[in-house]
């Protein structure tokens, strides 16, 4: 077959077309340190940002190494097909098309904020709260038109889409904006890390880097199922007659007839615990102007799954939440929401999928003899009985410089008392606040501080619980394109299950200090 004469023009044209694209690439680098799993690692990172048209691509190419020069291998693991997939996905910080509110918008990668509708199920969800300890690559998309709006999200493609949800809203029903939402977490255990790929999460795996073993009852470094283990529970009494036992001469010995064994850990490939929910909302716009609007709305949600009674351990079906009346308004630089809320039968939480969800999704406690017990967020909903109350939120843009946001949720009703071992009448309150610098001031390039305290009798006592998270971000310019970036986040885990936060082992700090530069 005759080859075209001008085929040589193809690479030339490709090179010409690539010049404008390459000229738009923003090459960014960073050096510094970061805390991962309680250990400080040095980092060298390249983060190019590639904009073209409505598209934007940001990569995150980073190497972590410790003081001995050991490289943190999780980000560069090519040991299996699954590891290769996750390693390649990790390099994407985001791929974006358009912006929220556009006719078509999509973003793959880091999700800093996701809301569905008025937020009865999903409000301020983020998959970045454990970054860089956990790098999640999710999806958020919108399809907007005059008659119908579609939006959805996925938390992480690396866990093969564990959490996902969506909402469809339309004005074709009675001429009012009506929305239908659905959210599902197909396996709440998928948020647990499994380094060796044996299906047993690290927190329950006594050999997190060896996929052949996972249980070591006495903690002597020899697995219970290892032929070399002759005293499983470490009580000094031989479990079996075996010539491989050091010093064994064939003489009769007393055998252990009461061997304590740790329980088998869950297998992420076989064990699952899902939860689902759906919601319906209806709005009614009262006033619609450029700088002033007021709307009324109502919404109801039903959660589908099983929780447990905190006293008896009885399995109970999840409940529903109802907002009979809500008000949404915008006046100038301020936005305001007010809701009257009801939980008729308990076993429900408003804004269940929130900023803390990836941390609260599965908790663990250490019992006697270091026995690990996992508790999903769903399993703890049994401590909430019938409740009523209100919710208020204010977002204020203070000129072009600052944005302040605060919300307060005040419910009253039946709540389980750990000390009295019964349901009592008490308050259930939530407080969230954040302050963000929108425009650089002198050498301060950006700044943000936030605090969240959920589901406590009084959030203004500022007593830390598992529902607390706080942090800040700060960027200071030093000239010549150099910026010092400081990020700090603190959350908490009740490791011993006593209902209180105490000690460093129940505090989770994530700190990143780096100097970034552009070239």
Give each language-model segment a name:
Residues 463-487:
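C-terminal structured "cap/appendage" subdomains that terminate the fold
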Residues 57-94, 121, 308, 315:
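Surface-exposed loop and membrane-interface regions of Gram-negative outer-membrane beta-barrel proteins
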Residues 23-35, 50, 55-59, 106, ...:
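Transmembrane beta-strand segments of Gram-negative outer membrane beta-barrel proteins
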Residues 10-20:
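Bacterial N-terminal signal peptides
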Residues 25, 39, 69-71, 102-105, ...:
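Signature for the C-terminal beta-barrel architecture of outer-membrane proteins
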Residues 2-11:
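Bacterial N-terminal signal peptides that target proteins for export
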Residues 226:
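Acidic-aromatic/histidine active-site loop/patch
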Residues 95, 198, 505-519:
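Outer-membrane beta-barrel "beta-signal"
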């Amino acid at each position: 077959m005759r080859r075209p004469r001008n085929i040589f023009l193809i690479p030339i044209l490709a090179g010409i077309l690539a010049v404008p694209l390459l000229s738009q690439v923003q090459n960014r680098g960073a050096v510094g340190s970061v805390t991962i799993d309680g250990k400080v690692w040095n980092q060298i990172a390249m983060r190019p940002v590639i904009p073209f048209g409505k598209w934007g691509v940001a990569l995150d190419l980073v190497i972590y190494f410790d003081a001995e020069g050991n490289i943190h291998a999780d980000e560069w693991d090519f040991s299996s097909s699954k590891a290769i997939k996750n390693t390649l996905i990790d390099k994407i910080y985001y791929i974006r098309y358009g912006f929220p509110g556009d006719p078509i918008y999509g973003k793959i990668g880091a999700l800093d904020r996701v809301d569905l509708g008025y937020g009865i199920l999903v409000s301020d969800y983020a998959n970045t709260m454990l970054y860089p300890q956990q790098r999640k690559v999710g999806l958020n998309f919108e399809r907007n038109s005059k008659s119908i709006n579609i939006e959805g999200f996925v938390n992480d493609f690396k866990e093969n889409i564990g959490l996902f949800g969506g909402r469809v809203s339309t004005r074709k029903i009675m001429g009012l904006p009506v929305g239908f939402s659905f959210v599902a977490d197909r396996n709440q255990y998928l948020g647990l890390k499994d380094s060796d790929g044996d299906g047993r999460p690290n927190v329950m795996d006594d050999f997190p880097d060896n996929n052949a073993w996972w249980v070591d009852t006495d903690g002597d470094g020899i697995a219970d199922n290892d032929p070399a283990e002759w005293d499983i529970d470490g009580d000094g009494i031989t479990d079996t007659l075996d010539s491989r036992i050091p010093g064994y001469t064939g003489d009769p010995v007393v055998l252990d007839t009461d061997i304590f064994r740790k329980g088998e850990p869950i297998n992420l490939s076989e064990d699952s615990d899902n939860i689902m929910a759906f919601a319906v909302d209806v709005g009614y716009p009262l006033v619609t102007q450029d700088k002033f609007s007021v709307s009324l709305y109502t919404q109801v949600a039903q959660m589908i799954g099983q929780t447990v009674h905190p006293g008896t351990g009885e399995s109970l079906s999840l409940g529903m939440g109802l907002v009979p009346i809500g008000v949404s308004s915008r006046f100038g630089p301020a936005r305001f929401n007010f809701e009257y809320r009801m939980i008729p039968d308990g076993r429900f939480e408003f804004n269940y999928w929130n900023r803390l969800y990836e941390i609260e999704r599965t908790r663990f406690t250490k019992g006697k003899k270091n026995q690990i017990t996992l508790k999903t967020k769903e399993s703890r909903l049994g401590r909430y009985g019938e409740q009523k109350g209100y919710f208020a939120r204010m977002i204020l843009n203070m000129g072009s410089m600052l944005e302040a946001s605060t919300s307060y949720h005040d419910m009253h009703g039946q709540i389980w008392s750990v000390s009295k071992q019964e349901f009592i009448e008490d308050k259930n309150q939530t407080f969230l606040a954040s302050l963000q610098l929108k425009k650089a001031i002198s050498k301060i390039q950006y700044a943000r501080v936030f605090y969240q305290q959920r589901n406590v009798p009084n959030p203004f006592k500022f007593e830390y619980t598992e529902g607390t998270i706080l942090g800040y971000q700060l960027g200071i310019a030093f000239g010549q394109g150099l910026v010092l970036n400081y990020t700090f986040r603190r959350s908490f885990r009740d490791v011993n299950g006593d209902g209180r936060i105490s000690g460093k082992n129940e505090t989770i700090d994530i700190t990143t200090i780096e100097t970034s530069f552009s070239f």
